[in-house]
């Protein structure tokens, strides 16, 4: 992370981690072990709240028909995160449910009816969420 930051001249306040499946699990690990290196995280088709790090912005993508990482396990992870970070539901727009905590840290959860495949239609919302944090 340090080498990439130096080589590509990135700064943590403008750097986000995103990963799908195992990569999504790695996003959760980065949240726990290197939270200072990222402004926010976007795990997709993953579970991982056991890595619980400090309060940070999250855009989570989960699919109800995922047979590799069952939706119930993904849901348990994000419900745990909602409770740990003291998030309150702020509304729903389409497939995205928005949350914020009393300090203004935000989380959005995109839920679709797909399988374990990456939900490409989640990308515009993810990009908009990250841009809103800059």
Give residue spans per PLM region:
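Hydrolases whose catalytic domains are alpha/beta-hydrolase-1, hotdog thioesterase
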Residues: 26-30
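Conserved serine/cysteine hydrolase catalytic core
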Residues: 49-55
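C-terminal catalytic histidine-bearing segment of alpha/beta-hydrolase fold enzymes
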Residues: 57-61, 67, 71, 75, ...
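Conserved G/P- and acidic residue-centered "switch" motifs that form tight phosphate/ATP-binding loops
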Residues: 23, 66
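Residue-level marker for beta-strand->alpha-helix junctions and adjacent short loops that shape enzyme
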Residues: 48-49, 65
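Gly/Ser-rich "nucleophile elbow"/oxyanion-hole loop immediately N-terminal to the catalytic nucleophile
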Residues: 1-22, 32-37
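A conserved short beta-strand
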Residues: 36-47
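Alpha/beta-hydrolase-fold catalytic nucleophile elbow
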Residues: 18, 43-45, 61, 112
